Amino acid sequence: MSDGGIEIDFQAFYDRFTKLGKAYSGFEGSPNSLLFVLGSTNEENPYQKTTILHNWLLGYEFPATLIAFFKDKGVIITSSAKAKHLLPAVTKFEGSDYKLEIWQRNNKDANHNKKLFEDLIKLLSENGNTVGVPTKDSYQGKLILEWKPLWEEAKKTHSLNVIDCSAGLSSTWKGKDDKEKAYLSVSSKGSDKFMDLMSNEIVNAVDEELKISNSKLSDKIENKIDDSKFLKKLSSDLNPLCPTDEKFDVNFLDWAYSPIVQSGSKFDLKVSARSNNDSLFGKGSILASCGIRYKNYCSNITRTFLIDPTDEMTDNYDFLLILQEKIIDDLLKVEADPTSIYEKTLEFIKEKKPELLSHFTKNVGSLMGLEFRDSAGMINAKPTAHKISENCCYNISLGFGNLKDSKTGQVYAVQLADTVQLSSDGKPSTLTKYTKARSQISFYFNNEEENKAATVKSEKSKPPALPKPDGTSKILRSKLRGESRADDEEKEQIRKENQRKLHERLQKEGLLRYSDADAVDGDEKPKHFFKKYESYVRETQIPSNVRDLKIHVDWKSQTIILPIYGRPVPFHINSYKNGSKNEEGEYTYLRLNFHSPGAGGVGKKTEELPYEENPENQFVRSLTLRSKDGARMSDVFKQITDLKKESTKREQERKALADVVVQAKLVENKTGRTKRLDQIFVRPSPDTKRVPGTVFIHENGIRYQSPLRTDSRIDILFSNIKNLFFQSSKGELIVIIHVHLKNPILMGKKKIQDIQFYREASDMAVDETGNSRRNNMKFRRYGDEDELEQEQEERRKRAALDKEFRYFAEAIAEASDGLLDVDSPFRDLGFQGVPSRSAVFCMPTRDCLIQLVEPPFLVINLNEVEICILERVQFGLKNFDMVFVYKDLTKPVSHINTVPIEQLEFIKTWLTDVDIPYTVSTINLNWSTIMKSLQDDPHQFFLDGGWSFLATGSDDERSDESEEEISEYEASDEDPSDEEVYSEEEEDYSDDEKFSDEGSDDFADGSEDDEGDDWDDLEKKAAKADRNSNYKE
């Protein structure tokens, strides 16, 4: 049955509710009743028994709900809104000997709710003093706060004995019906598909030697569940596995846990393992695990991928395959004791490979279903009353950890996990079918024999060593121009080779990232988003002054009211397009144009239309009104124009704030001493006055508190911080802690993504005379005679200030529990550039390129950069431009203009060192056009060669260069939509002023015939002169 989007199988609800109601008396401890209290949803722990009970009975979790089971009936206490979904179930129990009662709470009547709780407690005490509850469950919420005091008092008053019923619940729902088996098949097939995706990503990363961490790789897989194109393909595979009366619903597909990737020498074979931040290590073994759940039914799969394995590794993996097969086929039998299964497994290992016994996992699996890991159904050495039974589902997981290869000394691990379902006759079948054959999971990238042969060959082909010059020689290595040039050319060749590999990798990644499904259908029409609005709901809302049959502008309702045939007709301002006013003779004509489908001005760039196209709809495109009252018509036209401007401005503000995410609340630190940093200025500031405030570190974030008002503060959560920077006062007048956010936050009505805390590094005061008596002066150390001491004091102050800020930045990172890491710029690697309106000093950090001194700030995360283009690189120009294109194609490109040409070689080297491919262009490119074509069809873009259209001669800018005078800078497009920062203020600055080249005219005067030899010719002549010289002194 479906009600408001919630579909409940009431037959399954009846069967399961009565099953538990009649079976609980046989639970351990013989409870007289069962009680389940669920408060707010706990997304951090979705596997609590009460939550699972709700999912088992209803298919959903009903927050703020109590469920109680008695000998002859069950009682559900919930809100009236939820009760309407459950009331149809009551009729199912009318002919049964087990009844259902639903008691409705009233959020506005506390006394009524209290009476319901007291009646329930009375029923519990009347049925007996032993109450079964899942004692490990923990929930929060308003209902818990209301219930808990009454319950604690009732336990004392009625001498209630509370026992744990968790094991009994597990035994009740461990057997799966046909519908539950279908859900498990769907989730297992989903796990197979995601494992296939994981294996492709892992092998590609190892093959391409990508620098990616285990956690980043797992995050990439985890985010794929939100990829609509991938889910569309997945749906067609999973739909046939659904129950016959259901269709696959992607909204019920979710992760049972975050995917896990483990490599290197650190392996954790427990279900609680997590991907670490170490780089993916492409040698030995890589463990990959993922689990999908569908309609809350879980599945699990783990595979080991062997990279260039030794014989010992493959032998141990083959033994693991045999061991898993033995457990599933021979030991997992109905009525078998889980402890016996584990002991027989250990005996088999001791018999075949005793050296692996100490490395074996502490269990080989557990019950699985709505609960990912049911502790009551563990298969380990611990004795349990649980027995293997038909229709159960198990996660069979086993492996050997902390193994050390005897040949190479490398630490590795092997592990396998599969979802196994027992049928009604007790026969096990493996639901996760992704391959685990050694031939399919072993990959060889480095052949040792080939490497040795190549090494011998290279040694044989080496030229004989040249005799070293002795100490009496007049020819020194650094004296010859040719030798210096040879070194530079060698470095350049290395850089070119590295760039070639980076471009090849970029092309391969592009083809892998985008498939045919990403290509936009040429016949597909662009999607329009239709604005929904209405001026008035009822006719009585129309202003009374419209009776004069004149044009009126209702600012409150954003409406133009026009008199048509003696009736006031409202037109919402969103329907108004533009208008004009003309005077002809004694009449003033007012023409109003309205939006309509197919009308001019509604082009491809229009993202929103005021109407939905429908052939049955009729539209007014324009109206012309005339009047002899010219002043009145002018005033009306002005009001309409102003109203349209206000509406447009409001819509632009709404779009600008569309990506603002509402943050969770900051949890203040109420235990221990709160770390703080005083006398801090903030940019941007919530106050109009410039006053220093205080920064506090709390449990889940930091807070800046202004001294002017208690509500004047900025809260920043650790989870929303993307980058945390510390910049010392070296070479600057301020010391900085800078926070770059993942999602912008609001400060007043302004959207901000960068927040900076700083303090001035020096307070300058100068005594120009130096003749005053020192003891009588306020600033007694500021005389000329103490200038050296003053400088030393200045250095000490700066060092102390840097130390204080650095410690506080590290304290922020430490309080984030590993979410953040402090990054600092390398000043020696910095260069001048113009990312916005003025020249600033840009500096690389470990992960970013930043400029934090002068707003607007610049933060470019290097791992998000797809490619860098160096523009206007020509002979005769003193500077060039940099353009960063991001992997997220929807993100505008970032420009850094007017970089000194002397920095070109250094920047090329730096880009190569951080694995960013670059190309060189002699002109400014039209990035709005390039990015639009790339966004429209990225798959075809990479099929056509990707960024190779820019790479021709990209690192040989001296070839085919023109020496004619060109403009140093031209905007790439009139529409600055590809710029990262743009405002109307930029119009005050002319391009000539911002990007002028003072020396460019030097190359324009005179013809080419008048010029002397270029630098290349002069270098050749000098080298020839060196060779002809006898180097005599």
Curated annotation (Swiss-Prot):
One of its GO terms (molecular function) is nucleosome binding. Residues 454-474, 776-795, 953-1033 are annotated as: Disordered. Residues 957-991, 998-1017 have a biased composition (Acidic residues). It is found in: Nucleus; Chromosome. Residues 1018-1033 have a biased composition (Basic and acidic residues). GO terms for cellular component: FACT complex. Residues 99-124, 479-509, 638-659 form a coiled coil. PANTHER family: CDC68 RELATED, FACT COMPLEX SUBUNIT SPT16. Component of the FACT complex, a general chromatin factor that acts to reorganize nucleosomes. The FACT complex is involved in multiple processes that require DNA as a template such as mRNA elongation, DNA replication and DNA repair. During transcription elongation the FACT complex acts as a histone chaperone that both destabilizes and restores nucleosomal structure. Forms a stable heterodimer with POB3. The SPT16-POB3 dimer weakly associates with multiple molecules of NHP6 to form the FACT complex. This is FACT complex subunit SPT16. It comes from Kluyveromyces lactis (strain ATCC 8585 / CBS 2359 / DSM 70799 / NBRC 1267 / NRRL Y-1140 / WM37) (Yeast). The gene is SPT16.
